[in-house]
Every structure is written in C-alpha cells, then in structure tokens.
C-alpha cells in the first residue's frame, strides 16, 4: 500500500521535528480549495444520500484483512465498519475499491475532494485514513474524523525456532531472516536499525500476505509489519508478539475516515455512528470475527 506506507513514513518525519512538538501547523501553508466544482462531483449532502438510499465508500483493493473481494462479495474489517456507518444513516453501503496512489495526499485528492483526471469516482467517505494532527492541518479540503481503531507494528515468528521465553526482537535479525513488505515502514526501520547491521537478513515481498506465506512455509524465520495483517496470516506453526521497538517513531498510529470538507454534517453523522459502535462493542466484534486484536483508538 504505497499511499499508507509513504504517509506513515512522512508522519514519522513530522513527529521527529521541532515544529511538530511546539505547533503541528507552525509551517502550514494555505492550500487551494476546490472551485467551481459541481455538487455531484465533490460529494453529497445528508438529505441527498438518504433520498437516494445509498452512499459510496472508498476502500483499498486487495488489502486483507481490511478490504478485499471474495467471489465478487466485499469483505474485511473496513467493509463491515462502513456497513455499520451506512446502517446508522439509514442507507445502503456501496464500495469503490481503489488502488493506492503515491501518497495519502493523492488518494484523498482522487477519492474525496477532486477526483482522478481519468475515470475517477468521488466517494462520500474514505476508510483507513491515518490520523495525525500535523497532516490534518495540511489538507484543508478534507475533514479527518471517525477514529475507529489503532494499528501497530509487531513481529510474527516461527514457534519451532523461537521459544516463549526467547521471542525475536530486531537485534536477532543480524543473524536470522525476517520478511517485510517492500518499502514499508518496517522495511525502512530494519534497514537502518543498528547502523544497517540487519539489512542483509531482510527479505522483501510485494505485500504482507506473501510475507506471511513465506513465514508459514518456513522460508523465513520471522515477519515484521502491522499487527492486524500478521494476525490474519498466522498458522498453527507461527505466533506474534509486540516487543519494544527502540527508535521507531511511528510504531503505532490511529485510523479514521475522510469526508469532503464541504459536507461537515455528513462527517458529524459518520463520527457519531462510529462512536456508538465503539461504545456498544460492535467494532470490537468485527475485529474478533476476523481473528484480530482490537486496539481502541485515541479520540
């Protein structure tokens, strides 16, 4: 997921800066907002959505356990949370599966506030948007809201190699192999860890699904990546844990949704729906149904 990877790396850089510590918007420069764009292009009001009986969610394609299609049927954590939102608003949830762009800015521009130059569709809501105050003030065209979970980095491992009292930590990967998603934050972290001492043992895969498949097949000793993806790919021969990760600026982040800035009433309604589902346990049950740990968001 190029957009999420690039965005999380950027957030790590922001978090390490002095401007962020004092004022996340200290170096903020005003951005252009959409001009002369029709209502059917930039989004829709609440009453229009309820009259038409459905709303459109942008979700990332081929991204288990969060959003994918199985025999043409949408599945995943983000799909089920989107359905909760739509149900609370009294409409049907429809989905636009999108590929990740170069960064989160591009994804928000193409899917929420402007539209792609060719064949783009504007969604009412975009799921799985990393929430950060420094990034939030840099994208005026979008309302960041509806924080519904946290994600964090973990390490999955072969239980035949590592015993319960000797689970792997990054220092082990000076000698042991570890699988990561190529160009992910885990890849960048391990490549620079201890002055690059573990970089030679890092095995890179196109995505975490393939990385976990390699671990389960005994082709690598461990895998490092987002906890949810690791848990979803576990087998009877593998397990996962979360050791302290020294120097990892963004080992945990909050996930929410994005709505076009022109439709704040919709953003409020979406946030309310998510808040209710957090309070009554429905979102936690969604994670449980996919065999995942639920990490409550900071709201």
Task: Walk through the language-model features, giving the residues of each.
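Extended ligand-binding regions for polar small-molecule ligands
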Residues: 22-40, 82-88, 159-163, 175-177, ...
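Extracytoplasmic small-molecule ligand-binding "clamshell" domains
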Residues: 23-25, 31-124
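A ligand-binding cleft/hinge motif common to bilobed small-molecule-binding domains
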Residues: 127-138, 191-192, 216-251
């Amino acid at each position: 997921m190029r957009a999420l990877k690039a965005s999380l790396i950027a957030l790590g850089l922001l978090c390490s800066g002095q401007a962020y510590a004092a004022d996340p918007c200290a170096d903020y420069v005003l951005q252009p907002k959409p001009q002369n764009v029709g209502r059917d292009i930039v989004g829709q009001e609440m009453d229009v959505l309820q009259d038409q009986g459905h709303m459109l969610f942008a979700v990332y394609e081929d991204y288990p356990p969060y959003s994918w299609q199985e025999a043409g049927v949408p599945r995943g954590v983000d799909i089920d949370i989107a359905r909760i939102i739509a149900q609370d608003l009294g409409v049907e949830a429809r989905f636009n599966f999108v590929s990740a762009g170069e960064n989160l800015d591009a994804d928000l521009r193409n899917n929420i506030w402007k539209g792609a130059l060719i064949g783009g569709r504007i969604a009412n809501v975009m799921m799985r948007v990393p929430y950060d105050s420094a990034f939030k003030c840099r994208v005026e065209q979008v309302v960041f809201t509806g924080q519904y979970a946290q994600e964090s980095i973990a390490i999955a491992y072969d239980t035949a190699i590592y015993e319960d009292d000797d689970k792997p930590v990054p220092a082990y990967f000076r000698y042991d192999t570890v699988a990561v998603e190529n160009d992910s934050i885990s890849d960048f972290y391990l490549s620079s860890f201890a002055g690059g001492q573990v970089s030679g043992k890092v095995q890179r895969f196109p995505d975490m699904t393939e990385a976990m498949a390699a671990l389960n097949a005994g082709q690598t000793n461990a895998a490092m990546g987002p906890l949810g993806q690791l848990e979803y790919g576990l087998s009877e021969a593998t397990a996962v844990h979360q050791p302290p990760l020294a120097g990892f600026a963004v080992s945990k982040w909050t996930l929410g949704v994005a709505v076009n800035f022109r439709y704040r009433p919709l953003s409020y309604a979406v946030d309310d729906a998510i808040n209710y589902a957090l309070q009554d346990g429905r979102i936690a049950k969604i994670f449980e149904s996919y065999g995942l740990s639920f990490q409550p968001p900071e709201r």
